[in-house]
């Protein structure tokens, strides 16, 4: 790498993909952004070289040539695309660079630092989509909590016993069972005077 080079950072925050560019020309007064394109579909990551149109593109990963016939069948290159099938975050994360055949990787203007997490059923989403899902989930959860609260409150109110006053002509059933029947009553028949039983002489004055 030459002195006076510039590093720049681009991010794909949800996919944890960072891009650093390197400018190899000291005479350039400004910095031009030509980022690598990264697309993820399931467990496949596809990189697109930002420069050298019409040239045969070669790729390196951590200073090692990749994308040739001798490489793994899960890694392949087609024109300016590099396909990484069954991407592994531990083994395939790192620096990537593309350059035309006949030149050196050190002469490339941009490098890519790639770190991505993939899964078979993953779906790429932007920040607004994630925020919308979170807000909707909070609203639905809050609505369900309110419904449960008011339902339990109404159920408790209906479960309270309702008693009628004496003016309405009724008493509670519990009181009717505990209180004895009024006197006089056939259940309390007086002792006959003609019989001399054990209790025949009790309370004769009142009888």
UniProtKB/Swiss-Prot annotation:
Chain's role: Part of the TCR-CD3 complex present on T-lymphocyte cell surface that plays an essential role in adaptive immune response. When antigen presenting cells (APCs) activate T-cell receptor (TCR), TCR-mediated signals are transmitted across the cell membrane by the CD3 chains CD3D, CD3E, CD3G and CD3Z. All CD3 chains contain immunoreceptor tyrosine-based activation motifs (ITAMs) in their cytoplasmic domain. Upon TCR engagement, these motifs become phosphorylated by Src family protein tyrosine kinases LCK and FYN, resulting in the activation of downstream signaling pathways.
- The ITAM domain extends over 178-205
Q: Which CDD domains match?
A: IgC1_CD3_epsilon (cd07692)
Per the record, the major location class is membrane
Topology in the lipid bilayer: Single-pass type I membrane protein
Residue span of region NUMB-binding region: 175-192
Q: Which gene encodes it?
A: CD3E
Q: Which organism is it from?
A: Homo sapiens
Cellular component aspect of the GO annotation: alpha-beta T cell receptor complex; cell body; cell-cell junction; dendritic spine; endoplasmic reticulum; external side of plasma membrane; gamma-delta T cell receptor complex; Golgi apparatus
Assembly and binders: The TCR-CD3 complex is composed of a CD3D/CD3E and a CD3G/CD3E heterodimers that preferentially associate with TCRalpha and TCRbeta, respectively, to form TCRalpha/CD3E/CD3G and TCRbeta/CD3G/CD3E trimers. In turn, the hexamer interacts with CD3Z homodimer to form the TCR-CD3 complex. Alternatively, TCRalpha and TCRbeta can be replaced by TCRgamma and TCRdelta. Interacts with CD6. Interacts (via Proline-rich sequence) with NCK1; the interaction is ligand dependent but independent of tyrosine kinase activation.
Q: What is this protein called?
A: T-cell surface glycoprotein CD3 epsilon chain
Q: Which of UniProt's keywords are assigned here?
A: Adaptive immunity, Cell membrane, Disulfide bond, Immunity, Immunoglobulin domain, Membrane, Phosphoprotein, Receptor, Signal, Transmembrane, Transmembrane helix
């Amino acid at each position: 790498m030459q002195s006076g080079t510039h590093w720049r950072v681009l991010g794909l925050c949800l996919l944890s993909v960072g891009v650093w560019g390197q400018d190899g020309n000291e005479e350039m007064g400004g910095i031009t952004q030509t980022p690598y394109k990264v697309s993820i579909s399931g467990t496949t990551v596809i990189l697109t070289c930002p420069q050298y149109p019409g040239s045969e593109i070669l790729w390196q990963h951590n200073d090692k040539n990749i994308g040739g016939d001798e490489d793994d069948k899960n890694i392949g290159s087609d024109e300016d695309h590099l396909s990484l099938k069954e991407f592994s975050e531990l083994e395939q994360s790192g620096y990537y660079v593309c350059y035309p055949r006949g030149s050196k990787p050190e002469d490339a203007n941009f490098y890519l630092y790639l770190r991505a997490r993939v899964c078979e059923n993953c779906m790429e989403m932007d920040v607004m989509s994630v925020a919308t899902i979170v807000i909707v989930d909070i609203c639905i959860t809050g609505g369900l909590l309110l419904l449960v609260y008011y339902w339990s409150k109404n159920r408790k109110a209906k479960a309270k016993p309702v008693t009628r006053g004496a003016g309405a002509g009724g008493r509670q059933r519990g009181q009717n069972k505990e209180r004895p029947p009024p006197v006089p009553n056939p259940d309390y028949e007086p002792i006959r005077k003609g019989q001399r039983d054990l209790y025949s002489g009790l309370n004769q004055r009142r009888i």
